[in-house]
Regions:
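Alpha-helical linker/edge segments of TPR/alpha-solenoid repeat scaffolds
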Residues: 17-20, 52-53, 57-60, 89-98, ...
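Short, amphipathic alpha-helical interaction segments positioned at domain boundaries
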Residues: 255-269, 326-342
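Alpha-solenoid helical repeat architecture
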Residues: 1-11, 19-23, 35-51, 59, ...
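Short amphipathic alpha-helical interface segments
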Residues: 185-198, 265-281
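DNA-binding patch around the recognition helix
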Residues: 216, 220-258, 302-322
Length: 342
């Protein structure tokens, strides 16, 4: 039974590295339980670390953190300890906690130095480069500024109305207005915020929200309806006033308005964020990690392939997708942590 459990763990680790994620969570849980039952605490701890890594990869941050808390760090093999701290750093980065992420990266670097394995040191260096890369863009009064993770964290705590285009919501102090399921309202809000303190012309709003090149009366009528819906969502944080040429945001309490946008935007940014780890991914694993349908992933991959951003290896079920070249591609805000509903 012990040898079989170790073989299952090895197979699960290979599956994780090759991004063959189907059924992997159950396989790791089974292997971890069997190894612990046989008293193989080192490999059981290693299986727990792999569980946390998988949960982070698929965006389940609370579960990943809970698994890390159950691990006995002393039981972990020396080669597993840097990765364990990298998982902790990844959780902190996704939650926009720069200090916690930096501390975890420092511990990962110290842990990687002990076994003297060059590949571990390289993995830590790659994670630190991702931490140091721009994590977001501040758009305010017509100006754009790149922010690192600490800058994003400070912005989220500032006393302003922040249109968070990474998580599709409006932040005003402790109040959150989620708009993730309302792309038209989010597009209108962002256009209004980017124009503030001025007004946004109706033509701009129609183009941003409805992609209408030649607006007719039906488009204008729909715009009035959607602006009315947006007013209801923004109260009591802000109002929307009609002007001669469009609409303008009116924040309550004299707060200023800014937009937090991802450092890189465009269609299928989430796919590129995952592929930026340099691994070869199956389309099914990408769908699992992004929590979208396989058909949506296939369409996105085909579009990225036509644009020269990705390429594939293998055929049929063995096909894997890789990014062609995206050095330093920042992923932190492209794969955000879930935001609690108001």
């Amino acid at each position: 039974p012990l040898a079989r459990a170790r073989c299952r763990l090895a197979a699960a680790e290979i599956a994780l590295v090759t991004r063959d994620l189907g059924g992997l969570e159950r396989a790791l849980g089974t292997a971890r339980g069997a190894l612990a039952a046989q008293g193989d605490w080192a490999n059981a701890a290693h299986a727990g670390y792999l569980q946390a890594r998988l949960l982070l990869l698929t965006g389940r941050l609370d579960q990943a953190e809970a698994v890390l808390e159950t691990l006995d760090a002393a039981a972990l093999p020396p080669a597993s300890r840097p990765g364990c701290w990298l998982v902790a750093a990844g959780i902190a980065m996704r939650r926009i906690r720069a200090g916690d992420a930096r501390a975890a990266l420092d511990r990962a670097a110290r842990a990687a130095h002990q076994p003297g394995i060059a590949a571990l040191a390289a993995e830590v260096a790659q994670a630190r480069a991702a931490f140091d890369a721009p994590a977001g863009r501040l758009i305010e009064s017509g100006r754009e500024t790149l922010l690192d993770l600490a800058g994003v964290e400070a912005l989220l705590g500032a006393d302003l109305l922040l249109v968070d285009a990474c998580r599709n919501l409006l932040r005003g102090g402790a109040t959150l207005v989620p708009l993730a399921g309302r792309p038209v309202l989010m597009a209108l809000l962002r256009a209004l915020a980017e124009a503030w303190p001025g007004d946004a012309p109706r033509e701009t709003l129609l183009a941003r929200a409805f992609r209408a090149r030649h607006a007719d009366e039906s488009h204008r009528a729909r715009l009035r309806v959607e602006i009315g819906r947006l007013r209801e969502h923004l109260s009591p944080l802000a109002g929307i006033k009609a002007t001669g040429r469009g609409f303008v945001l009116e924040p309550c309490g004299g707060r200023r308005i800014a937009v937090l946008a991802p450092p890189v935007e465009g269609d299928h940014a989430g796919l590129l964020a995952l592929l930026a780890d340099g691994e070869a991914w199956s389309s099914s694993a990408l769908a699992l990690a992004l929590d979208v349908s396989p058909r949506s992933v296939q369409r996105g991959l085909k579009a990225l392939e036509r644009a020269g951003r990705v390429e594939w290896l293998g055929h049929g079920r063995a096909r894997r997708w890789v990014a062609r070249s995206v050095p330093g591609f920042p992923t932190g805000l492209l794969l955000p942590a879930p935001v609690p509903m108001r």
